[in-house]
From Swiss-Prot:
Residues 68-127, 134-189, 235-294, 302-360 form the CBS domain. The chain crosses the membrane at residues 527-549. It comes from Arabidopsis thaliana (Mouse-ear cress). This is CBS domain-containing protein CBSCBSPB3. Residues 1-20, 30-44 have a biased composition (Polar residues). GO terms for cellular component: membrane.
Length: 556
């Protein structure tokens, strides 16, 4: 399998033979990218990049198309960063592919790019195009490429996302973490049953002959080297850990990520860890919610009391913790409870494999054979039905029965949203309010129209229009949540509300949540405002008076 990389490769080792290395501008420190170029601003080649030529798989070898692939979110490269983040949040993904005016793949942007290239640089997401910060001409694979080779390349290169192309079109996005979780689960289960070791031994014996001495001792050595070492063996004194205070703004956290080239920061109070903030949190909880990184404090959007591991925790236990919790970053504490490091699943897995591959001679060759056997076993694992629709945080909520995960809140899409309504004088008000509290929303509305929120009789009914054109009353917190969820799913930046002050609407039962569709004339009357009610009532009164006068004159 060959891959494409027309821009400079990242310092993480992601490169191909066609890579052209270019030095960064002297005036600006390069920002490491996940896929392809360093700064994401390399020029596009004049001619179309060559399609990667896939190695023909032999019988029995799995291809990329048989891996757990996710449907790729593809947007035009002229989209703003804010809109891209909003769409990623709606899809609960942390990467999207970009296309040019010819609908061809031109780049990829990830949560790390948003944090380190936009927020850390002080750029405004609503005024910055993704084409300015994306990684151009990303490396990709064809759907018939060897799965094992693709996975090993991603682990060695330490990158997560890989576009999958079939017949010249992007069909999916490969997220290595999902495959790693499968591998971890499979290897742990197989190790307990002994089947993986037996299969590996069988493969070694076929290749090296049954006369190889002490295979059991070799296997034990392999297990000792790969699974049993403590995290302290892969964490050096120079390990980078980004620390911020709870009162620091998100912009400061993003700059720490950029400067240390990490994807997360630890929030510490004194010497104790009180939270963690990742680049995905910045995308989902800050940018997608249109919050100001300079004014939003870290403590408002961090994950409090994260699960931690000690330096004595084994590599296997650390992987198991992250696998069970479906999260990607794990803070490491020393014996005093202070933050020693923060590792991600790719770092740990890469370190574990490196321990095996750093062996010498025949031991190294057989170790590689063993690793391939383990990968093959992992690839044969059937994924859960709903795996591709879960994010790392939503999965934790689905596994709420695991007590140690109770400290992690649902990532969600934030607890606020933008609303808009027109008051009695025809003025339009736009504001941000909690997306789960109707009382809070009503209070803001009443304040904007200059009425007393404590006077229930003066409160209007709040109505919105759903995706089918029906007029729906918001009478409870759950109604509000449903309205906001619908707005987000349809890509709306703001939910337009309609206020109804009429007595007929106010007398409706609170259990009534939807008004049926009428004809076009009735549809207009369904949005009757207070002013419209006065006009209609006045017309009825005047008509009645006119009839009375006419009857009196006729009688006379």
């Amino acid at each position: 399998m060959s891959t494409q990389a027309t821009g400079p490769s990242s310092t993480s080792g992601r490169r191909s033979n066609s890579t052209v290395r270019r030095g960064p501008p002297p005036s600006k420190k390069p920002v490491q990218s996940e896929n392809g170029s360093v700064n994401g601003n390399t020029s596009k080649p004049n001619s179309p990049p060559p399609q990667p030529q896939s190695q023909a798989p032999s019988n029995g070898e799995r291809t990329v198309k048989k891996l757990r692939l996710s449907k790729a979110l593809t947007i035009p490269e002229g989209t703003t960063v804010f809109d891209a983040c909003r769409r990623m949040a709606a899809r609960r993904v942390d990467a999207c592919l970009l296309t040019d005016s010819s609908a061809l793949l031109s780049g990829i942007v990830t949560d790390k790019d948003v944090a380190t290239r936009v927020i850390a640089e002080g750029l405004r997401p609503d005024q910055t195009l993704v084409s300015k910060v994306m990684t151009r001409n990303p490396i990709f694979v064809t759907s018939d490429s060897l799965a094992l080779e693709a996975l090993q390349k991603m682990v060695q290169g330490k990158f997560r996302h890989l576009p999958v192309v079939e017949n010249g079109e992007v069909i999916a996005l490969l997220d290595i973490t999902k495959c790693l979780y499968d591998a971890i689960s499979r290897m742990e289960k197989a190790a307990e049953q002994g089947s993986a070791l037996a299969a590996a031994v069988e493969g070694v014996e076929k290749q090296w002959g049954s006369g190889y001495s002490a295979p059991y001792a070799f296997i034990e050595t392999l297990r000792e080297r790969m699974f049993k070492p403590a995290l302290s063996t892969i964490i050096t004194d120079n390990s980078k850990v980004a620390l911020v205070a709870p009162s620091d703004p998100v912009s400061v956290a993003a700059k720490r990520m950029r400067d240390l080239r990490v994807n997360s920061v630890i929030i510490s109070t004194g010497n104790k860890i009180s939270g963690i903030l990742t680049s995905k949190d910045i995308l989902m909880r800050v940018v997608a919610q249109n919050l100001s990184p300079e004014l939003t404090l870290v403590e408002k959007v961090m994950t409090p009391n994260p699960e931690c591991a000690s330096l004595e925790t084994t590599i296997l236990d650390a992987l198991h913790t992250m696998h069970d919790g479906k999260f990607l970053h794990l803070p490491i504490i020393d014996k005093d409870g202070s933050a020693a490091a923060c590792v991600d699943v790719l770092q740990i897995t890469h370190a574990a494999i490196s321990m095996v591959e750093n062996s010498s001679g025949a031991v190294n060759d057989m170790a590689n054979t063993m690793m391939q056997k383990f990968w093959d076993s992992a690839l044969a694992l059937e994924p859960p039905d709903d795996s591709d629709t879960q994010s790392e945080m939503s999965a934790m909520m689905h596994h709420s029965d695991i007590g140690k995960l109770s400290s992690y809140p649902s990532l969600g899409l934030g607890n606020s949203f933008s609303f808009k309504f027109e008051d009695l004088k025809g003025r339009v008000h736009r504001f941000t309010s909690g997306a789960e509290n109707l009382e809070e929303l009503m209070g803001i509305v009443m304040q904007r129209i200059g009425s007393d929120n404590n006077n229930v009789e003066q409160r209007p009914q709040i109505i919105y229009e759903d995706d089918e054109g029906d007029k729906v009353l918001i009478t409870s917190d759950s109604d509000l949540v449903g309205a906001v969820t619908l707005a987000r799913s349809t890509g709306q930046k703001v939910l337009r509300l309609h206020l109804d002050f009429t007595e007929s609407t106010r007398s409706l039962s609170s259990e009534t949540t939807q008004l049926k569709k009428g004809d076009s004339r009735d549809r207009g009357s369904g949005w009757v405002s207070w002013r419209g009610g006065v006009v209609v009532t006045g017309a009825v009164v005047l008509t009645s008076i006119a009839i009375v006068v006419y009857l009196k004159r006729s009688k006379n």
